[in-house]
Amino acid sequence: MDIMRSVVGMVVLLAIAFLLSVNKKSISLRTVGAALLLQIAIGGIMLYFPPGKWAVEQAALGVHKVMSYSDAGSAFIFGSLVGPKMDVLFDGAGFIFAFRVLPAIIFVTALISLLYYIGVMGLLIRILGSIFQKALNISKIESFVAVTTIFLGQNEIPAIVKPFIDRMNRNELFTAICSGMASIAGSMMIGYAGMGVPIDYLLAASLMAIPGGILFARILSPATEPSQVTFENLSFSETPPKSFIEAAASGAMTGLKIAAGVATVVMAFVAIIALINGIIGGIGGWFGFANASLESIFGYVLAPLAWIMGVDWSDANLAGSLIGQKLAINEFVAYLSFSPYLQTGGTLEVKTIAIISFALCGFANFGSIGVVVGAFSAISPKRAPEIAQLGLRALAAATLSNLMSATIAGFFIGLA
């Protein structure tokens, strides 16, 4: 029954996308079918197929090892505030977001910058981009951007496409925006992992977002024009560093900006949510609903969607609440709310944890529309009106991509 519910959930998400399509007759079954099969195949290999699961587990161990090196840098600055004694002192509640998550973002951003400098990232992106281009029958610029989102966030994507943006057709531009919103950056992945989200789920979700973003981009806005973008030399930075030290330093400074942005937004939004909950609770108290909150409203509204995706009805309220927080605020705040359920152990089923982890894994939220429109408009002012028109539809496509990955994850974990 649960397996069939997951299948129905996939069909429902595809049906929603079809209803939102701007040109239903031009939908390419070749591209859409291949993207869906590839998204399912990646999920099956990484979550169900034993050799694939083993590979993901080893990769997760590697990420944990990388995080331990990040702790060395944090300990040098903050001392015992990042050590195990904090958990003893505070009876298991010694996790401090500012000292554990934010330094990891800085470290990993610097590491990624180094890997770009020595050519590892460029080689990997070229190989994967070529595979996805041929498998999905998409343009080179679309595959290039989609694969790059594994490592870079939506803030960096505009800089990558800057040399080509004036030659990109409307569909390619839409796909680029969708890919950025549907994905997470490598540096942010470490941040989520620092809050207890299983790394193997984050790795799988990151890869599944590549075909997932293209799948829903091509349903909501089918390709109707041939690509005009041709290039030989792919550039990953507008001003590439000239030395190993410069690469590390510039990456660290970029990481600092990201960490500062994350800290500022999370601090502000957590406070705003508390204020909104106080208002809702006060008004609700007049009618006998003193415990009403923004989270409970999201939970009631989105619980049916969470259930059709495969979450048990007993947990659907929680899942719906977290999905709502992610959409209305951002994924970091949603993961922060999810974190206590990951620390307690045994309160949620493995399948539920997986579905929620995948559903929250992406930049798709209303705030991202402003980020994307502002960033893309800055590099191509003449296309600003067109970019603004694509924002809300791109958010819908990216959200559906995240929910599809979550539904597929629930399907395969239900089989295990």
UniProtKB/Swiss-Prot annotation:
A biological process term (GO) from this entry: nucleoside transmembrane transport
Periplasmic side: 1-2, 53-104, 194-196, 290-352, 416
Keywords attached to this entry: Cell inner membrane, Cell membrane, Membrane, Transmembrane, Transmembrane helix, Transport
Record's bilayer topology term: Multi-pass membrane protein
Keyword DNA-binding attached: no
A GO CC annotation given for this chain: plasma membrane
Subcellular localization(s) per the UniProt record: Cell inner membrane
Pfam families: Gate, Nucleos_tra2_C, Nucleos_tra2_N
Main subcellular localisation: membrane
GO MF: nucleoside transmembrane transporter activity; symporter activity
Transmembrane segments: 3-23, 32-52, 105-125, 173-193, 197-217, 269-289, 353-373, 395-415
Ranges per topology, Cytoplasmic: 24-31, 126-172, 218-268, 374-394
InterPro entries the record matches: C_nuclsd_transpt, C_nuclsd_transpt_met_bac, CNT_C_dom, CNT_N_dom, Gate_dom
Family: Belongs to the concentrative nucleoside transporter (CNT) (TC 2.A.41) family.
Its job: Could be involved in pseudouridine transport.
Full protein name: Putative pseudouridine transporter
Name of the gene this protein is made from: psuT
